[in-house]
Amino acid sequence: MDQTPRRMLGQPLSSPATQPKKRSTSVMSFFSKVSWNLRLQKQEPLKNVFFILAETARDPSVKKRHMVMRGLGTMACETPDKVRKYKKIILDLLVHGLYDPVSSEVIHESMKTLTIILGKMQGKALGSFFIDITLQTRTLLDDENDSLRYSAFVLFGQLADLAGRKWKSFFTRQVKQTQDSLLTHLQDRNPQVAKACKTTFRACSPYLRQSKDYSFQNEEDQRNPKLCRQLVSERGQETFFQSLRSRCRCKAEGGRHTRELPP
């Protein structure tokens, strides 16, 4: 992740002393309008709501950008049929939020909403968005923020299930480049992140078996072609993960993560 300073999730966004109070009011007014439009779509076409969201998603205000991502998540839950109809517009907005250069809150909300929407779309008609989402999600697996890491592992595991035949080769390469992160965060000091990583590890195991490089050990260690066969075996899973704990202890100690996820 870039070195741009970020606020901790859950902390209120600070605002300059010169910032007018009117801005806060305008944010609330905007999303009251969006919420109202969701309930009264017959009075105002939903496409107008998307026009407002698209414009606001590029607003200089972090609060507005963050609330756009949250609003898209609400729309995905309340109007799933409309989400399918406008999926390209929605995905474009969410990918834009996923690459937000300033705010971890915007990125986090984008990932959470993408998880909802991809589940409803079942991976259909993702097109090149699949590449954009995968590349950015992979970079967030090692982020210092617990919530970002957690959501990134959840989303990456979902992408593993949705890759299909079209993106099989591409995703196999991405998983291979993610091996160190997967191994390290099996030992993540945040138990929720470690659990999400373990689930994603299993989802990625078919792609690991297709790779010629099966190793999850240090570079100087011997390659182990039995790794994935052991991983996907029901009997061997727990033994496998227990053995990994001792192997990657040194790596984990280099980047201990102790913060808890916000409720």
Curated annotation (Swiss-Prot):
It is found in: Nucleus, Nucleolus. HEAT repeats lie at residues 128-163. SUPFAM superfamilies: ARM repeat (SSF48371). Disulfide bonds: none annotated. Residues 1-21 are annotated as: Disordered. The keyword Manganese does not apply. Keywords: Nucleus. GO terms for cellular component: nucleolus. This is Protein maestro. It comes from Bos taurus. The gene is MRO.
